């Protein structure tokens, strides 16, 4: 069996860094997320955007993959999800199996956990089963590690983000998606405690300005992260492709914000 972190890097970080275009928001937040840029409601638009910007992959839920995935960009199939209609303790359970992900052409699978929730045990237990299946089918497992509920007051506090990273490592992630602390120095500690597991920053809600998000990305790279898994901060923008290409210059080209970018 190949090292699945190495396999993830070969597929999703061919140039040494990674940009993944996340698009699991339809179930997580609903169609309201598509209103800023109505084109983004069309999964074919998302595939073109990822392909034309030269991104390393996309994240889809199973229904989108079944109807739209064309193999033009590597796929991370998200195995679980929740809605904003639910108002209880944070929990997200599987709606797709690793075996089904393989049949849909996925190159990796993703799963969200909410450490701190009253249901963390349920998600940890399910993640263990998914990890066994991912090893069986030779698919890297990307863990979205978002402490939430319980004692968690500030989800981006440095100690919480670092804990999230360590939990993902301990539970067998081959790559992880965690939130940014807002500062490269504190985020570098999260990257360190993630050990050998590559770190992707969660893009989060669209920032007020494009430069605000580019500054976040620059800080994340300075901290030693592999890259970003971003959705709304790209496809909610009216000129999404232009901004996506600016991100590519920053992440892949090693440009700094002090230099001219394609924005």
Swiss-Prot record:
Q: Which UniProt keywords apply?
A: Cytoplasm, Glycolysis, Lyase, Schiff base
Q: What does UniProt list under activity regulation?
A: Activated by citrate.
Its UniProt entry gives the catalysed reaction(s) as: beta-D-fructose 1,6-bisphosphate = D-glyceraldehyde 3-phosphate + dihydroxyacetone phosphate
Could you name the active-site residues?
146 (proton donor), 177 (schiff-base intermediate with dihydroxyacetone-p)
CDD domains, alphabetically? DhnA (cd00958)
Q: What is its EC number?
A: 4.1.2.13
- Protein name, entry field: Fructose-bisphosphate aldolase class 1
What's the gene?
fba
